[in-house]
């Protein structure tokens, strides 16, 4: 990771945090009525009967986040072909750690939340916000070795893959087989353009990807799946920055960290404190998310990394201390944008959404703060 990219990650993390803070301030000020317009102003896209009519909040969550998952897909494809995921030996431990980091928070949440009305939120504390995490890693600089950062990124990649699967399987509320079939045809068209006709024009995949996204929204499956599958269909060539996948990933990166994620954070993090008491922190849903992110994530990930290191099943881990592994396990508890995103998909009740936002913010802040403290002040030998 070059110096300029490190600066981008740091600045992106700060902008993301500022956007979330601004949302909370605005939603608890005289400007709150304007903030509410995100859910009252509708925008239409389409012609005649082929129209998508959604409010601004939905456009952000279904449109901008589909672009974010397109970027994630491009990143994962590169890692599978030429990156850390191209070697099986580099995959096994981070994959199992990511799974444990998904399972443990979910189990903690479900152990606290037995009401059928809130069980659907089990996946909220299972996510990791890679943008925020990379921002803190950039802030730590050389205190975190490059290989340790690579381990965090690899775990986060598997976390993202799991999140995509969870959204597609568990948060699809209705299904139109006709629209889904049409979307699948556009995906197949991209595969044919790539594998058979060897078309390398990015614009072709952008147009076909847009129609795949449009059909996916109409089908009832969440649009993020269209973004991810589109990425897997785009041609990638090693050592060629002009290949469509490389070009699109490089082009999207600044838009993701400086615009898309901050806009999402601003739209979804606006906790309203009106009528809320301190006791909301101890409501089952809030407590389940806080403990899931802060306790479940670190417990699940660190236990796997430490045990595999002890058994010498984790070659890369031998160069790290247990404190370093514990520090990055804490950072993986920063759920923020991804946790908020799953929360919005799971519920639409205002009180529950407020409880979710508080749980996500508190759990993420605790994880980020203590992860930073461990890696910055307690780890004595970062090399």
UniProtKB/Swiss-Prot annotation:
UniProt cross-references to InterPro entries, sorted A to Z: Na/H_antiporter_dom_sf, NhaA
Lineage top rank: taxon: Bacteria
Membrane topology term: Multi-pass membrane protein
Keyword annotations: Antiport, Cell inner membrane, Cell membrane, Ion transport, Membrane, Sodium, Sodium transport, Transmembrane, Transmembrane helix, Transport
Entry's Gene Ontology molecular function annotations: sodium:proton antiporter activity
A Pfam family it matches: Na_H_antiport_1
Compartments (UniProt record): Cell inner membrane
Main location: membrane
Transmembrane annotation, as ranges: 10-30, 56-76, 91-111, 121-141, 150-170, 174-194, 206-226, 254-274, 275-295, 327-347, 355-375
The protein's role, per its UniProt record: Na(+)/H(+) antiporter that extrudes sodium in exchange for external protons.
HAMAP family: NhaA
UniProt record similarity statement: Belongs to the NhaA Na(+)/H(+) (TC 2.A.33) antiporter family.
Descriptive protein name: Na(+)/H(+) antiporter NhaA
Organism name: Francisella tularensis subsp. novicida (strain U112)
Gene this protein is translated from: nhaA
